[in-house]
């Protein structure tokens, strides 16, 4: 089996496949991993969680076709996801693969997680009193109010953080208060990426991707998302500060607490996914290192391989 470098005469490099949700990144990664002698390193924050399969569109074991996937199913739903911890584990996985002569494929739509691997992303300190005050604001007024406040202070960070992600909103507002600088100012300016990485972005026409999102959400509910949430409730999903706020899961939990209208939960989930796609697109389009491809184009895998050989 060949590697990325087989025609380059050098060691394999990291290939990052990024872009909005629903574009086909995971499927392309498996195709390329088979051809390049590679393994996938997950960069989707919610696919870190065990049991969160249907609602995150995690590839099944069969769909992975024997390609090893790293950093899937590594957290319990009660654990809080941390970009700093992810950075350590993902870089370790990438470096082990490179040392073994394997091609790492960093795959996902969580922009901050991707940047944590590729760039010199540092993490500002914390202030427990400031954080506690913002957590109280979250409890009293809700995540949407904090998101509006963040948009006033740092529109770039607001684009990158979901209005439902209270934990990340609190952290961003905490950093702004204790440093006196926008949260986004702590993000590194993209330069030469670590590991000599090649960055590939997938996107689709807006209407086409919206339709794909709607179909994906319909299938999630048809394929048992509500049952998955009920099972995860038994494992402490409601106590999970990160997992309980994932798109789809939060909406199902709300309906289980209320009228039980899962059609309404599905409609809200689809709407929020479409909104999330636009935020992802805005985040990734700022990174000029990314080579963009229409995910619908024929021969996509071959075109990406050709890019690696240039």
UniProtKB/Swiss-Prot annotation:
Catalytically driven reaction(s): adenosine(37) in tRNA + dimethylallyl diphosphate = N(6)-dimethylallyladenosine(37) in tRNA + diphosphate
Sites marked Interaction with substrate tRNA: 110, 131
Keyword Heme among record annotations: no
Signal peptide: none
Alphabetized InterPro entries for the sequence: Dimethylallyltransferase, IPT, P-loop_NTPase
Pfam family, one: IPPT
Protein residues bound to ATP: 19-26
Keywords for this protein: ATP-binding, Magnesium, Nucleotide-binding, Transferase, tRNA processing
Catalytic activity, EC: 2.5.1.75
Cofactor needs: Mg(2+)
GO molecular function terms attached to this record: ATP binding; tRNA dimethylallyltransferase activity
Positions that bind substrate: 21-26
GO annotation terms (biological process): tRNA modification
Endoplasmic reticulum listed as a keyword: no
UniProt record similarity statement: Belongs to the IPP transferase family.
NCBIfam families reported for this sequence: miaA
Subunit organization: Monomer.
PANTHER family: TRNA DIMETHYLALLYLTRANSFERASE (PTHR11088:SF60)
Role this protein plays: Catalyzes the transfer of a dimethylallyl group onto the adenine at position 37 in tRNAs that read codons beginning with uridine, leading to the formation of N6-(dimethylallyl)adenosine (i(6)A).
Protein name stated in the entry: tRNA dimethylallyltransferase
Organism of origin: Saccharopolyspora erythraea (strain ATCC 11635 / DSM 40517 / JCM 4748 / NBRC 13426 / NCIMB 8594 / NRRL 2338)
Gene behind this protein: miaA
């Amino acid at each position: 089996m060949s590697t990325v470098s087989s025609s380059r005469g050098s060691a394999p490099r990291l290939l990052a496949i990024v872009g909005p949700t629903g574009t086909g990144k995971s499927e392309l990664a498996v195709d390329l991993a088979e051809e390049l002698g590679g393994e996938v390193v997950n960069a989707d924050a919610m696919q870190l969680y065990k049991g969160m399969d249907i609602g995150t569109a995690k590839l099944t074991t069969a769909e992975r076709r024997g390609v090893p996937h790293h950093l899937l199913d590594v957290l319990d739903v009660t654990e809080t996801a941390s970009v700093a911890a992810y950075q350590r584990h993902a870089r370790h996985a990438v470096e082990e693969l490179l040392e073994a002569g394997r091609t790492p494929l960093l795959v996902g739509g969580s922009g901050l997680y991707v940047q944590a691997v590729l760039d010199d992303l540092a993490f500002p300190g914390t202030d427990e009193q400031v954080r506690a005050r913002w957590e109280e604001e979250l409890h009293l007024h809700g995540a949407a109010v904090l998101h509006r406040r963040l948009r006033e202070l740092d529109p770039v960070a607001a684009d990158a953080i979901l209005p439902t992600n209270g934990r990340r909103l609190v952290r961003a507002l905490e950093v702004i208060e204790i440093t006196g600088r926008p949260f986004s100012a702590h993000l590194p300016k993209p330069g030469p990426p670590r590991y000599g990485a090649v960055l590939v972005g997938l996107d689709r026409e807006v209407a086409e991707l919206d339709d794909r999102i709607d179909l994906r959400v319909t299938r999630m509910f048809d394929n048992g998302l509500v049952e998955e949430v009920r099972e995860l409730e038994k494992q402490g999903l409601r106590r999970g500060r990160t997992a309980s706020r994932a798109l789809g899961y939060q909406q199902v939990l709300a309906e289980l607490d209320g009228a039980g209208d899962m059609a309404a939960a599905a409609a809200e989930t689809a709407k929020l996914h479409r909104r999330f796609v636009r935020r992802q697109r805005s985040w990734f389009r700022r990174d000029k290192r990314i080579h963009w491809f229409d995910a619908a184009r024929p021969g996509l895998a071959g075109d990406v391989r050709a890019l690696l050989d240039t």
